[in-house]
């Protein structure tokens, strides 16, 4: 076995190729074969594994971006983290083996996958038969993948020959030289270099900094990923963390800076990108729009398309390995990185179809189209979404088809149906089980525990082919699914999104009602989280009415935090009502967070004459947490929160001792005694 692999290894070095070798069997056997390969072939042999000592854990693999290694081992015997697999492949140099250890071939389907704990809505690891069948098919169908199964003869197929490959000498390629010349002549504008991994976009950015006769700054989601840029720039350009750069630009002139280079731009929230490009005369953004950071072609359609005169440049020729690299080709097929969707210009009637997860495996072309549309529309789509799509529990899928071609995709997630006892604990801040994003959030943050008991479906993703947008297709899919959800006995359907006036107008057009706005910016979108629902049952309508009334009542205090007006009618009445007492009791006697209780606490301060120094310092005098801790000589944030809760309890007792005692008991546990006034029961 080893002499044959040695001959293949020598050819890989000469031809600039990387290959996948799959070891399938029990863990000890796989580990032994991988160890023998490591002894035979000199190299870095980076391991990603849950089990091997000193290996990189799959969830820590992102820290490897921007680095290079010779040979790697990916241990998938306990679970297959698809992003980590792609990241490891992206770090491997020409001539590398990627050795993937997997369970016994015929038992792999039935084995619980540890990675499913990350993305399945339910607790505990589950088998993932659909994804495993998909991966097994890709391994078996690719004649350039070597598969060695325990207790079976190791058959090495005849491999095609490639011409000899020359390692880049550090000078720009002809294509890089052409782009670099254009950039060096630029007077102003936004330039975007788009390329898959290994094409030299970071190298090109570094060359621009090195050759530019002026000042260049560099930013990226993480400094570690800019190692190549800084290497080729001779460390000339100053690096800034995104948040620090924005803070500096808001307070200082940057007119003497000629270029801002933004590496891995698609991983930065678009509002931050739009603000950054407003400060500098020349901007260069480099990014990949296919791959493991969850950066799809939505970056082109949603960001680049909104910039007048944006110059989009592409690098296609690989620099770190040869053209038609077997490992890259296999990975693109296995993780569906090629998101090209067949164009459909037909104006014929559109039909809506429901699909089950098993059909993705039975019709792989359908899977490719459905996932491709999601990737083209959402530039945060990643291999984790592919795993959810294939095997996560409680998923429903609708597709819009025109002329037998898929032109729209809708992905729903089942939520709610929790017990009254668990919903009460979620409301009280004592429990936060996995899943149920909107249903739990309405209970935990909006004070609506009944939302977690009612049955609902959440829109996880909705996407339409680029050339068929603004034709009512998304609206049609949602209306189709809304009817299905009503037939299935759902109480409401929901959606969570980063709030912008434009996005809210879209959901409002689909009939949704705004029920919640968060007060912390989302890392992914740079916007505040908004939640909206479309009620389907009488209980759903009652929930919607109560949620809207509460949002309108809290709007004044929420708007002061988020800095813009909400599309609701503010209520001027600041007297305490029953909902306020319930909320304040949850803060004083349970574990509801300050952010959820803040509007009720502000009303409490207006209606109570007690000093309540800790609360007033933070909420009325707007002292920071650090200032409050120092002023009151407390031992940190936890001590301050405890004091806030004690002051709230003191205020409630001072207003009505009997009522305060009732609500204290009410918060303790859901029981027959508190059913009368419990929103879960109404």
Curated annotation (Swiss-Prot):
One of its GO terms (biological process) is rRNA acetylation involved in maturation of SSU-rRNA. ATP binds at residues 176, 198-207, 320. Acetyl-CoA binds at residues 462-464, 502. Keywords: Acyltransferase, ATP-binding, Cytoplasm, Nucleotide-binding, RNA-binding, Transferase, tRNA processing, tRNA-binding. It is found in: Cytoplasm. It holds the Pfam family TmcA_N. Residues 357-534 form the N-acetyltransferase domain. Gene3D superfamilies: 3.40.50.11040, 3.40.630.30, P-loop containing nucleotide triphosphate hydrolases (3.40.50.300), tRNA(Met) cytidine acetyltransferase, tail domain (1.20.120.890). Catalyzes the formation of N(4)-acetylcytidine (ac(4)C) at the wobble position of tRNA(Met), by using acetyl-CoA as an acetyl donor and ATP (or GTP). This is tRNA(Met) cytidine acetyltransferase TmcA. It comes from Photorhabdus asymbiotica subsp. asymbiotica (strain ATCC 43949 / 3105-77). The gene is tmcA.
